[in-house]
Amino acid sequence: MTAFQQLPSSVLQTGAIFLSIIIEALPFVLIGSIVSGLIEVYITPDKVYHFLPRNRWGRIFFGTFVGILFPSCECGIVPIINRFLEKNVPSYTAVPFLVTAPVINPIVLFATYSAFGNSFHIALLRALGSIVVAVILGIFLGFFWQEPIQKENRLACHEHDFSHLSPVKKVFQVFVQAIDEFFDTGRYLVFGCIFASVIQVYVPTRILTSISATPLFAILLLMLLAFLLSLCSEADAFIGASLLSSFGLAPVMAFLVIGPMLDIKNILMMKNYLKARFISHFITIVTLVVLVYSLLIGVIL
């Protein structure tokens, strides 16, 4: 205890903020990991394909909103999308699912609601932002994109077929998948919590004030931060909430909306399965739509 008392107060404050953020976030990461394990073991692309509407618009909106029923963390969403495409689920259904599934599911929405002090409107704004991006991407792919988005000689997807397992073994595999997901996500969460706590303690308030005074720059900065941190969608709301007082609502909303869509690990996984031309269009559309959406929030709210 004496050793801790000898540490500078700034270090102790950083540690306290770090612990407060991570303790709030971990239960949601754990729940999300278990749900992800359930989906991995029990939900197959064939089952989803049977429920697809017949018309193009219906399929765009199906892909946009089906994530409410089948929540999936963005950490493993790209291989799932690859399997959908291989089962002839159209790209204008699969890609909107990629964008919204990590955001509009009940776990992430409740995590966002809790992180911002039981704020329903921030959770709603986040969901609305991801829906807008998903619909625009779906329209682009459904009506303007004329080629497959998958690579012809793509790397083999690391998948497992659990359909032949007994019920007991399936339950066991759910926990195996959940544990793997939890620890994979946890390392990104720890880094993000450290970063957020260091910013609050060591970055001078005048610097943060000058950044937030220029909305466009603040939005772009937090979009870049979301890309670099590569946080799990069950946990990023707690990091975003810790940045709200420093940057304001519009930049934090950009952070929350773009994070599950564009980050380092997702882009690297996309390169394994999807064409570079599509990825460049995807990055451009997502970035522009999130930027405009966040600027509008700054103007209206």
Where are these regions (language model features)?
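Selected transmembrane alpha-helices and immediately adjacent juxtamembrane segments
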Residues: T2-I34, D46, H50, L124-M223, ...
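Interfacial helix-start motif at the membrane-water boundary
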Residues: E24-A25, G63-L69, L228
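Membrane-interfacial helix-loop connectors
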Residues: F70-L128, V203-L274, F278
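Membrane-embedded helical hairpins/re-entrant loop segments and their flanking transmembrane helices
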Residues: S36-V66, L208-A213, I239-G240
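Short glycine-rich loop/turn motifs that provide flexible caps or phosphate-binding loops at active sites
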Residues: I31, F62, V66, C75, ...
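Structural signal for the C-terminal ends of transmembrane alpha-helices
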Residues: L38-I43, Y202, I264-K265
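Short helix-loop boundary/capping segments at the starts of domains
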Residues: E24, F28-I31, E40, T44, ...
